[in-house]
């Protein structure tokens, strides 16, 4: 098995696990705007968008940051988050799965 194939399988598995957790899925997808593009948000904005408790959203954002699914940028004393390249690949897996489901 070549390295790219192994990497693709791991991304698909990660996407499936996130997709099975409603909170994790909502937090990750909050970073995608209505045009399907990645957007920058702070943790409070994510919590308000998806209407989940701040502690839950903050913990999920922190875990995604530690896992490398989102990137953090300091703006003054605040931190802004956006999808990393890995996070974008996971979202692409969600989109691909949705298209497959529509074609069934």
Curated annotation (Swiss-Prot):
Keywords: DNA-binding, Plasmid, Plasmid partition, Repressor, Transcription, Transcription regulation. Changing residue 43 to A: No DNA binding. A miniplasmid containing this and downstream gene tubZ is able to replicate in B.thuringiensis subsp. israelensis and express insect toxin proteins. The miniplasmid could be used to make plasmids for insect toxin overexpression. The keyword Transcription regulation applies. Induction: Probably part of the tubR-tubZ operon. Homodimer. Binds to tubC DNA, the TubR-DNA complex binds to TubZ. This is DNA-binding transcriptional repressor TubR. The gene is tubR.
């Amino acid at each position: 098995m070549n390295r790219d194939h192994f990497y693709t399988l791991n991304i698909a598995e990660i996407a499936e696990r996130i997709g099975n957790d409603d909170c994790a899925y909502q937090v990750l997808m909050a970073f995608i705007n209505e045009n399907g593009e990645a957007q920058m948000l702070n943790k409070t904005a994510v919590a308000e968008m998806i209407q989940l408790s701040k502690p839950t959203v903050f913990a999920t954002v922190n875990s995604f940051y530690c896992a490398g699914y989102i990137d953090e940028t300091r703006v003054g004393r605040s931190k802004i988050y956006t999808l990393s390249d890995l996070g974008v690949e996971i979202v692409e897996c969600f989109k691909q799965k949705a298209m497959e489901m529509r074609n069934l």
